[in-house]
Amino acid sequence: AYVKKGIPQDRSNLKPAVTPGGIIESEVQKFVLDTVVAGLEVPWGMAFLPDGRMLISERRGTLHVFSDGKLSPPLGGLPSIMAIGQGGLLDICLHPDYSNNGWIYFSYSALDRESPRPAGNTAIMRAKLKGDRLTDQQIIYKGTPGTDRNYHFGCKIAFDNKGHIFFGIGDR
C-alpha cells in the first residue's frame, strides 16, 4: 500500500504545480510550458515519425497519432495490456533505421489472460504502422513470472548507434 500524506480530501482548490504559459527556471535554462496536445489522460511516451507526425502512448493502453493539430482515435492492433496501477502502455521508440524497416518498439505491461486475477509483466513488442493500426506484431521480450502487483514495470527504450536495443524493466 502507498501512504500519501498531506493531501486534502477536497482537492478542488488545489492548483497545478505549473500553469500553461508559465516560465520554469533551472540553474542553467528557462522553459516555457505550453500545451501541444490536449485530451490525453496519462501520456507516457512519444516518438516523431520521419514525416513529422507524432506517436503518443498513454498509460491506459492507447496509442495515438498527432498530426496537423489533431489527435487520432486510438490505433488498433495493440496487445492485451494490463492498465492498472503503474502498468499500461509505456514507452515508444522508432528503430534507428525506421525509414527503411518501419519498426516501432514499445514497452507495456502484458496482461496474463490465464491468471484468475489481473496479472502481467513488462514486455517489449515491435510492430509496423499501417493506416490506423499496428501490424506484424512481434514480442521480443516478456518478463516472467507474471505478477498481480500493479507497480514497478519500468520501462524506457533506447537504441545505440549499432542498432542494439536497451530498456529498463524496473522490478519486472
Model-flagged regions — what are they?
Residues 1-172:
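Acidic, Gly/Ser/Thr-rich repeat motifs that build Ca2+-stabilized beta-propeller blades
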